[in-house]
């Protein structure tokens, strides 16, 4: 356990722990607090559509994973192997059989020009969302596309430029509550272009936390576009050697969940990078026993709840 603590803190140099977002502390609380002292750890393709019609509220008191919407699957270790001293898994208290959603909702967020819509197209394996190089936002409404992947239905939600700091968090929260499909995302894909982590990207991450709450980062995966620009280097090397403390802090807050996308890739390469992304999604599901993120917007008027 000390190995994980030292390795994580060591990766961010002299940055003080007080600068970390709340999920960073939550991450270590799950490791340390959950273990008593002295004890060992134990569909056919559809076209993209605007999500503008009235939906059931995403704020529901009912369980986020319904029995009839899930399949039972034997418990297994997550894809990522954590080198814990006990040799056992990171998340504790999972049942031998757990609920695994048959439909997974992935929410794409990112600044204008990050490659967000192109990433959605890569995930879907077709041109479902309009994507082009532009200084102005191309996506102006919530859109979704679906595909089947390894027996699951993936629902990919592409978002307009609502995470800009110019927008009011309360108004943005209401839009999401009214328009986003119930019950909530199983994973948030924060799209960042390789070599271009700017103040705008940081603002998107902050706005994401303001809207959803700090715990949203426990469901967030960093997706780096233009992976092809890394040439012979790996994504891991890029993150470790970029000398951008803000990016490293965000990566730690997201528990080092990240992957790279070449949105020009086709065929086997395209499917391989989707598989890597889904391994990260599976890890989130494993840690949360199959539950999606329960969205709570305290600043939204009660009539929308």
From Swiss-Prot:
Annotated Gene3D superfamilies: P-loop containing nucleotide triphosphate hydrolases
Pfam families: AIG1
Compartments it resides in: Cytoplasm, Cytosol
Ranges where the record places region G1: 110-117
Tissue: Expressed in thymus (in thymocytes), spleen (in splenocytes), lymph node and lung.
Main location: cytoplasm
Positions of the UniProt region annotated as G5: 262-264
Keyword terms, alphabetized: Cytoplasm, GTP-binding, Nucleotide-binding
GO cellular component, one term: cytosol
Protein's UniProt keywords contain Metal-binding: no
SUPFAM superfamilies, per the entry: P-loop containing nucleoside triphosphate hydrolases
Region (G2): 137-141
Binding site for GTP: 110-118, 131, 226-228, 263
InterPro entries according to UniProt: G_AIG1 (IPR006703), GIMA/IAN/Toc (IPR045058), P-loop_NTPase (IPR027417)
Segments of this protein annotated with the region Disordered: 37-91
GO BP terms, alphabetized: autophagy; cell redox homeostasis; defense response to bacterium; immune response; kidney development; lipid metabolic process; response to type II interferon
Chain positions covered by the region annotation G3: 158-161
Span list, region G4: 225-228
Residue ranges occupied by any AIG1-type G domain in the UniProt entry: 101-302
Family, as annotated: Belongs to the TRAFAC class TrmE-Era-EngA-EngB-Septin-like GTPase superfamily. AIG1/Toc34/Toc159-like paraseptin GTPase family. IAN subfamily.
Name the record gives this protein: GTPase IMAP family member 6
Organism: Mus musculus (Mouse)
